[in-house]
């Protein structure tokens, strides 16, 4: 009975600790800055890809165009878009923006002494678990939300036509490379998988920044070293 009560109290403190960390992670200026930077880049990438598509293929007689399967959302969304430098900038900066979102928080709280106040209300284990979960989710969101925005922008103007393997080498994601089978057979699942993978790695980068802060106390170094 006593063990059950203690276990229940541990769960409550864990939940409260996680809620606190999530609130801090998603309600700080650097998270918003990272998110805004990435959203601006992906929206610009979407607009440029739409303009490039219009210029290259035109939409006047799209239904009669034999190259219609090439002029598809799955060719022009940010993961496969080669019409501008914006997608490259997004993916190059992603490790930095992921770490900037909340990866620096532990080093800041350690230097300020805030962590001592936190550990009065919860255990060190709960604090660390909550910190890593919140950091991962914040890092994942600064990738997921901008990519979703890019997809929405492109999808408003370019149809989600299923890719045709007949035009194999007209696609960036041609057969034989990662997830190419999924790209040609179930493109929407490919799009979801690539978005989730990017978000996953973005969250991992953020957690690397957090892990580094156990050894390095400088906030700038903690944020930028995983990017390098």
Feature annotation, model-predicted:
Residues 34-39, 219-228:
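Central hydrophobic cores of alpha-helical transmembrane segments
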Residues 34, 206-219:
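Juxtamembrane helix-break-helix junctions at the cytosolic face
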Residues 5-39:
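Aromatic- and glycine-rich beta-strand/loop motifs that create alpha-glucan
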Residues 38-103, 133-206, 210:
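Secretory targeting signals
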Residues 29-31, 123-125, 129, 218-223:
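Membrane-helix interface segments
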